[in-house]
Structures are given as C-alpha cells and as structure tokens.
Amino acid sequence: MNFPSKLLEDAVLEISKLPGIGKKTALRLVLHLLKKESKESESLANALLNARENIRYCKKCHTISDHELCAICTSNKRDKRVVCIVEDIRDVLAIENTNQYFGVYHVIGGVISPMERIGPDQLNINSLIERVITDTEIKEIILGLSPTMEGDTTAFFITKKLKSYPIKISTIARGIPFGGELEYMDEVTLGRSIATRTLFETKED
C-alpha cells in the first residue's frame, strides 16, 4: 500500500498493529479520525493514555480495576462464597452480561500451553491457591475456562491443586462447544451453562 503522506502511513502502521486490524481497516479508522474535530481525536488519545497509565489490576481477583480492589470484589451484593475462574477480563465481561452469575472472580491471565511456553508459574494460579487457603468463606470454585485442550489442561491442574481443600469444584455445563471461547458465546447459552454447571471430574476420580 503506497501512501501520499508519511504521517498517514505511520498512523496506519501503528493502528494495524492492534489485534484483528489489517491495514485497510486501519486506514479507514485513521481517515475517520482525521475528519473529526481535533478535540475528538485528542479525547481518544487522552482516554487511551489515561487508561494505560492509571488502570491497575485488582489485588484480589486480578481483573482490570480503577482501584486496588475492583467493584465486584468490594460489592456487598456479590456472593463471596462462589469464585469463578476465568482466563481474562473479556470472560468476566461476557459472564457479567448474562446477568446469571452473582459470585466473584479470579482471573488467571491465560491457560497452560506448553506450545507457547506458558506454565502454571506464568499464571495467577498460586494466588488462587493462597486465596482458597486464607479465605474460609469460599465454598465453591467454578471452572469458567474455555473448552479447549489448553483450558482442560489448566482446569485439571487447578483441580488437583485444590483437591485437598473442603470446597466444591464445578465447571460450566458443556453447552459451549469444544474449542469455543467464552467471550464469543451468546448471553443465553453462556448464562444457561453457568446456571446448569456440574461437578468437575478428573479421569482419576
């Protein structure tokens, strides 16, 4: 793609680095921004910079937050006895949109993947174990991981680590097809899968 302006080319190049955005889409976005009032472009830039500099991760559940503890962890309306384990913030948002879950979360930050050299130590699994040990209020862990090979491996690993503790370990029902990801499931299917969750069983059980 040949550009009549180096400035335009640089802007398109930077935006095309974002996931799922090719150069044609990036060009369309840049041209759209150029047509807007400068204040609107400045507002976008400031919002991104502000988010980058000030957003933090919840000290307890590791989801994105404006404060040390997120709004979900500090809410008196949430059932602190139930903790849903998810991969990242997108899964939290997907589950919240179902309006079917009222517990809290623990974001582990991915799944175990030997191919990508991601092991348990690279994830927020140790903090999950520590949370279960220290928080006697927790009665149930829901494995809200995507039904992929890596997701199942991670679920199995977590289950083995928590097996000796007096808590119920369940998994969202398999209304979600194998290989699918939670964030792409429709709200009705995902909500039903959470409501009809079942006990997680390993092959050794």
From Swiss-Prot:
A molecular function (GO) term: zinc ion binding
Top-level taxonomic group: Bacteria
Domain Toprim residues, every copy: 81-177
Entries under SUPFAM superfamilies matching the protein: Recombination protein RecR
Zinc finger (C4-type): 58-73
Family per record: Belongs to the RecR family.
Family annotation (SMART domains): TOPRIM
Assigned keywords, A-Z: DNA damage, DNA recombination, DNA repair, Metal-binding, Zinc, Zinc-finger
UniProt GO BP: DNA recombination; DNA repair
Source organism per UniProt: Cytophaga hutchinsonii (strain ATCC 33406 / DSM 1761 / CIP 103989 / NBRC 15051 / NCIMB 9469 / D465)
Record function comment: May play a role in DNA repair. It seems to be involved in an RecBC-independent recombinational process of DNA repair. It may act with RecF and RecO.
NCBIfam families assigned to the protein according to its UniProt record, in alphabetical order: recR (TIGR00615)
Pfam families for the chain: RecR_C, RecR_HhH, RecR_ZnF, Toprim_4
Protein name as it appears in the record: Recombination protein RecR
